[in-house]
């Protein structure tokens, strides 16, 4: 039975803390993609972004031991207010009203993610108050997408596989194609000819490269991969890094943005350090492809890392795969993650599963997220 296509709004702020709120409209029934709507980046004010960076630092010290850092409450209130305003602004700009919106998918800001280990469930913390957002927008808000999966033994990530599958449905002969998202970490979604999904974090992506550039006082990121392009990969350190046990570990598996750092290139030059970190990210993608039952021959890349041509060239070289940008296929590469959470919000309203044994390792397929009901606008 076909269900009506409805507009949903998705929100995402990544762990690289680029200072922006990603917000996107998507028309969907929770299974198919009806239309891509407008999307936008709304910057946090400088104070909020600085506060979130303090939260990441506090979360590392906290490590799920004892009471949460007090700073979380202030940050949660500020980002909920800012992201609510971003939703309202995008909806108005699109010529819609909140009455036209079925739900908002509010991921929140991840400050800490600890994957499960033998004998221990995983834990995760995203800052964001879904109840407050629902009250502000007078619209249903789906939030806290990861906790239930982790309490049931799953990795809590990646959540994007089912949306990536819907994107692959828009292509012909997609069985040889996988989707690679390059955010703070890199995650991949592949689907075989029978429609079976596999998804996992392959390794680091932008986070350690950005952190290295910031540490060297060279800005916020390696813009366009220019620094890495000037450097040479340190073969000895590169070879040692490739022996990291995570790379050969069977999926499902997930990472926190701090699981891979940049200390191991500390004594290299700026350019050589950036080149070596970038090559490691690219090779980790290749190692991830090697774990799949059928190795894809093409990657469609979304997320901020797709704007780094040096990284994309290295992925093609080290991972031995054809690399396309999301825009090459008519997708919105900057909006993919935000669109995903709009899609997941609609799936939650319909109680459709989001996580699976092949994606997060949870034993049985599960819906994701809690629903905060908003009253109709008056």
Curated annotation (Swiss-Prot):
Report the leader peptide range: none
> EC number(s) of the enzyme?
2.7.1.170
Q: Which GO terms describe its biological process?
A: 1,6-anhydro-N-acetyl-beta-muramic acid catabolic process; amino sugar metabolic process; peptidoglycan turnover
Q: In which pathway does it act?
A: Amino-sugar metabolism; 1,6-anhydro-N-acetylmuramate degradation; Cell wall biogenesis; peptidoglycan recycling
Gene3D superfamilies found in the cross-reference section? 3.30.420.40
The protein's UniProt keywords, in alphabetical order, are: ATP-binding, Carbohydrate metabolism, Kinase, Nucleotide-binding, Transferase
Membership in a protein family:
Belongs to the anhydro-N-acetylmuramic acid kinase family.
Q: What does this protein do?
A: Catalyzes the specific phosphorylation of 1,6-anhydro-N-acetylmuramic acid (anhMurNAc) with the simultaneous cleavage of the 1,6-anhydro ring, generating MurNAc-6-P. Is required for the utilization of anhMurNAc either imported from the medium or derived from its own cell wall murein, and thus plays a role in cell wall recycling.
Q: What is this protein called?
A: Anhydro-N-acetylmuramic acid kinase 2
Taxonomic placement: Bacteria, Pseudomonadati, Pseudomonadota, Alphaproteobacteria, Rhodobacterales
Q: Which gene holds the coding sequence for this protein?
A: anmK2
